[in-house]
Amino acid sequence: MASATLTAWIKMPSFLKKILKLRGRRQEDESRSRMLSDSSMLSCRVNQLTSEGTEAGSTTPSTLPKDQALLIEPKVRAKEKSQHRRPKIIDQVRRVESLGEQASQRQKHMLETLINKIYTGPLGEELVQTLYLRIWAMEETPESLKILQMREDIRDQVLKMKTERWLRTLIRGEKTKLKDFQKRYEEVHPYLMKEKVEQVIMEEAWSLAAHIVQE
């Protein structure tokens, strides 16, 4: 069969041989072009997937090998848990609206009376003057500087509100006893070491509220 084909090729006119050779080269070129085209399309698709993954933020566990995905998932869960954690002491200090609501009736009445005097009577004027002088005399901090530069009426209102917050922090629960009073101070002590202005205000609130505490 091969010898017959070879004999036919030898006997074939030269112009036909040229035509067949050109056709063969054309087929090879077309085949090579298709291969290059397929390779180019595959490369574009890979680049597109990579770009989409980058725009999404990061590679998801589903696109990673199984062992790497198992390592990433606990880290993600740990990060989510840490985001939900909040410092309990600071929350307790800053949450004003719920403090003092569960005090005993007698203590609650005394607490509200004291707060009313701070906002409406001479006790409040004496309080803000004392706080202003103590803050002025202390070592300068960004918070103390901010308060000292306030307009007088605004500063007085801010100091009264901060004092009220501390009063409601210290006097709360079914019945606040002296040991509870001391314990609440210890709870917020780390916070006060960083916030010297708050420490001064808390000390004045402590002094004002001491008569409410039952032995």
Curated annotation (Swiss-Prot):
**Involved in self-degradation and in host STAT1 degradation: where is this region?**
15-22
Name the UniProt key words of this record, in alphabetical order: Host cytoplasm, Host-virus interaction, Inhibition of host innate immune response by virus, Inhibition of host interferon signaling pathway by virus, Inhibition of host STAT1 by virus, Inhibition of host STAT2 by virus, Interferon antiviral system evasion, Viral immunoevasion, Virion
- Report the superkingdom from the record: Viruses
Q: Record's GO cellular component, any one?
A: virion component
PTM per UniProt? Y1 and Y2 proteins are produced not only by alternative initiation, but also by proteolytic cleavage of C'. Only alternative initiation is detected in vitro, whereas in vivo cleavage seems to be predominant.
Pfam families xref list: Paramyxo_C
Cite a single GO BP annotation. Answer: symbiont-mediated suppression of host innate immune response
Q: What InterPro entries does the database record attribute to this sequence? A: Paramyxo_C
Note on domains (UniProt): The disordered region at the N-terminus is involved in C protein self-degradation in trans. This self-degradation of C protein may play a role in the regulation of viral RNA synthesis. The disordered region at the N-terminus is also involved in the host STAT1 degradation in order to counteract the host innate antiviral response.
Subunit notes for this chain? The different isoforms interact (via C-terminus) with unphosphorylated and phosphorylated human STAT1 (via N-terminus), favoring the formation of parallel STAT1 homodimers. The different isoforms do not interact with host STAT2. C protein interacts with L protein; this interaction has an inhibitory effect on viral transcription and replication.
Give the family this protein belongs to, as stated in its UniProt record. Belongs to the respirovirus protein C family.
Print the miscellaneous field.
Answer: The P/V/C gene has two overlapping open reading frames. One encodes the P/V/W proteins and the other the C/Y proteins.
The free-text function statement in the UniProt record for this protein reads: The different isoforms prevent the establishment of cellular antiviral state by blocking the interferon-alpha/beta (IFN-alpha/beta) and IFN-gamma signaling pathways. They inhibit IFN-alpha/beta induced tyrosine phosphorylation of STAT1 and STAT2. Blocking the IFN-alpha/beta pathway requires binding to STAT1 in the cytoplasm. They inhibit IFN-gamma induced serine phosphorylation of STAT1. Block the IFN-gamma pathway by binding to and stabilizing the parallel form of the STAT1 dimer, further inducing high-molecular-weight complex (HMWC) formation and inhibition of transcription by IFN-gamma.
**Descriptive protein name:** C' protein
Organism expressing this protein natively: Sendai virus (strain Z) (SeV)
